[in-house]
C-alpha cells in the first residue's frame, strides 16, 4: 500500500487528494466477495434470483435466505456482509410499514429505496462508524408498475430494467446487456436469469440451489419452491 494512501484510508470522513474515500471503496470490495444476485423486469412484474452457496455441509441449507420480503409487494436481495444486510432489511421493513400505515396505499418503492440509501450514505460521512459492506437490489410493484432499483455502500441508487450485484456482477451484466429483452413472459425471464447466473460461474462450478422470487401486478410476493427451481436448472 502506498504511503499516501495509508494516510487517508483509516479516516472515513477525509477525502484523499485525488477525491477518493477509501473506506467506501473497501466496502464495495466486500460486496464483490458476496453471492451473485440479479433482478429483472418482465412482462407484468419483476423477479429476483440469487445464487446460494452453502459453505459447509453442516449448515442447514433452508436457513440461508438471500431474498428478503420487505412488504407484500416489495422484496430485496443482498450481497456482502450478512449482518449489515440484516440491519438494512429490518430498516426497510419498518420504513415500508410506516408509509403503509400513514398513507394506506402501496409502498412507493423509489421513496423506500431513497430512505435506505440515506441511511447508508450517513455512514460515509461521520466519524466513529464505517460504511455498510452490502449492496441491495429492491424489486416490487407500486402505483407506477414494476420497479427495480439497486443501492450500493455509498448510498448511490439507480433504477434498472435488469441489474446484478455480488462477485459475478460484471459477467451477469455483460450477459444481460446482450440477451435481455423487455416484456418477456415470466418463465422466459426466469430461464434467462438462470443462464445469466450460470455465466458468472467458474469452470467446474454448478448452480445448485438458487433462490427465485417474483412479484407481479395484482399478485403478492412469491418465492419459488425447490421443485419449481429444479425445472429451470
From Swiss-Prot:
Entry comment on modification after translation: The N-terminus is blocked.
Gene Ontology terms: cellular component: cytoplasm; proteasome core complex, alpha-subunit complex
SUBUNIT field: The 20S proteasome core is composed of 14 alpha and 14 beta subunits that assemble into four stacked heptameric rings, resulting in a barrel-shaped structure. The two inner rings, each composed of seven catalytic beta subunits, are sandwiched by two outer rings, each composed of seven alpha subunits. The catalytic chamber with the active sites is on the inside of the barrel. Has a gated structure, the ends of the cylinder being occluded by the N-termini of the alpha-subunits. Is capped at one or both ends by the proteasome regulatory ATPase, PAN.
SUPFAM superfamilies, alphabetized: N-terminal nucleophile aminohydrolases (Ntn hydrolases)
Predominant localisation class: cytoplasm
Organism expressing this protein natively: Thermoplasma acidophilum (strain ATCC 25905 / DSM 1728 / JCM 9062 / NBRC 15155 / AMRC-C165)
Note: The configuration of the closed gate contains an opening large enough to allow rapid entry of tetrapeptides but able to impede the entry of proteins and longer peptides.
InterPro entries: Ntn_hydrolases_N, Proteasome_alpha, Proteasome_alpha-type, Proteasome_asu_arc, Proteasome_asu_N, Proteasome_sua/b
PROSITE patterns: PROTEASOME_ALPHA_1, PROTEASOME_ALPHA_2
Example GO molecular function: endopeptidase activity
Cross-referenced NCBIfam families: arc_protsome_A (TIGR03633), PRK03996.1 (NF003075)
Role summary: Component of the proteasome core, a large protease complex with broad specificity involved in protein degradation. The T.acidophilum proteasome is able to cleave oligopeptides after Tyr, Leu, Phe, and to a lesser extent after Glu and Arg. Thus, displays chymotrypsin-like activity and low level of caspase-like and trypsin-like activities.
Name this protein carries in UniProt: Proteasome subunit alpha
Gene3D superfamilies listed in its UniProt record: Glutamine Phosphoribosylpyrophosphate, subunit 1, domain 1
Amino acid at each position: 500500500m502506498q504511503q499516501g494512501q495509508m494516510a487517508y484510508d483509516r479516516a472515513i470522513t477525509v477525502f484523499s487528494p485525488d477525491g477518493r474515500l477509501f473506506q467506501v471503496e473497501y466496502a464495495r470490495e466486500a460486496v464483490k466477495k458476496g453471492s451473485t444476485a440479479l433482478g429483472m423486469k418482465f412482462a407484468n412484474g419483476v423477479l429476483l434470483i440469487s445464487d446460494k452457496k452453502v459453505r459447509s455441509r453442516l449448515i442447514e441449507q433452508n436457513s440461508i435466505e438471500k431474498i428478503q420480503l420487505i412488504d407484500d409487494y416489495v422484496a430485496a436481495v443482498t450481497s456482502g456482509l450478512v449482518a449489515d444486510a440484516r440491519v438494512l432489511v429490518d430498516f426497510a421493513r419498518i420504513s415500508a410499514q410506516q408509509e403503509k400505515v400513514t398513507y394506506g396505499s402501496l409502498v412507493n418503492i423509489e421513496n423506500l429505496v431513497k430512505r435506505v440509501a440515506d441511511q447508508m450514505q450517513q455512514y460515509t460521512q461521520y466519524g466513529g462508524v464505517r460504511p455498510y459492506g452490502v449492496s441491495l437490489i429492491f424489486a416490487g410493484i407500486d402505483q407506477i408498475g414494476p420497479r427495480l432499483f439497486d443501492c450500493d455502500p455509498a448510498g448511490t441508487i439507480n433504477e434498472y430494467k435488469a441489474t446484478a450485484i455480488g462477485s459475478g456482477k460484471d459477467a451477469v451484466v455483460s450477459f444481460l446487456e446482450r440477451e435481455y429483452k423487455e416484456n418477456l413472459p415470466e418463465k422466459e425471464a426466469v430461464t434467462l436469469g438462470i443462464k445469466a447466473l450460470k455465466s458468472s460461474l467458474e469452470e467446474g462450478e454448478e448452480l445448485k440451489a438458487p433462490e427465485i422470487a417474483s412479484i407481479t401486478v395484482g399478485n403478492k410476493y412469491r418465492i419459488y419452491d425447490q421443485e419449481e427451481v429444479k425445472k429451470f436448472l
